[in-house]
Amino acid sequence: MPRKAKVVKDLKHFPKYATRQKNRCPICGRPRGFLRRFNMCRLCFREMALSGEITGVRKSSW
């Protein structure tokens, strides 16, 4: 029984929306439009890509 009580106690410390906390842009804190590959939101990605701060990223044109 003590082990079960410890597990229940540990579960109370987890945030309710853990995924939303994890997938936030570290630059602006935006929770939506998150790009996992670059670990930032789409707006910060666009600004940094256009200014040339992200290597290997170019604006596409055809």
UniProtKB/Swiss-Prot annotation:
Keywords: Metal-binding, Ribonucleoprotein, Ribosomal protein, RNA-binding, rRNA-binding, Zinc. Binds 1 zinc ion per subunit. HAMAP family: Ribosomal_uS14_2_B. The lineage of its organism: Bacteria, Pseudomonadati, Aquificota, Aquificia, Aquificales. Belongs to the universal ribosomal protein uS14 family. Zinc-binding uS14 subfamily. Binds 16S rRNA, required for the assembly of 30S particles and may also be responsible for determining the conformation of the 16S rRNA at the A site. PANTHER family: 30S RIBOSOMAL PROTEIN S14, SMALL RIBOSOMAL SUBUNIT PROTEIN US14M. Part of the 30S ribosomal subunit. Contacts proteins S3 and S10. Its cofactor is Zn(2+). InterPro entries: Ribosomal_uS14 (IPR001209), Ribosomal_uS14_bact (IPR023053), Ribosomal_uS14_CS (IPR018271), Ribosomal_uS14_sf (IPR043140). NCBIfam families: PRK08061.1. Transmembrane segments: none annotated. One of its GO terms (biological process) is translation. This is Small ribosomal subunit protein uS14. GO terms for cellular component: cytoplasm; small ribosomal subunit. GO terms for molecular function: rRNA binding; structural constituent of ribosome; zinc ion binding. Pfam families: Ribosomal_S14. Zn(2+) binds at C25, C28, C41, C44.
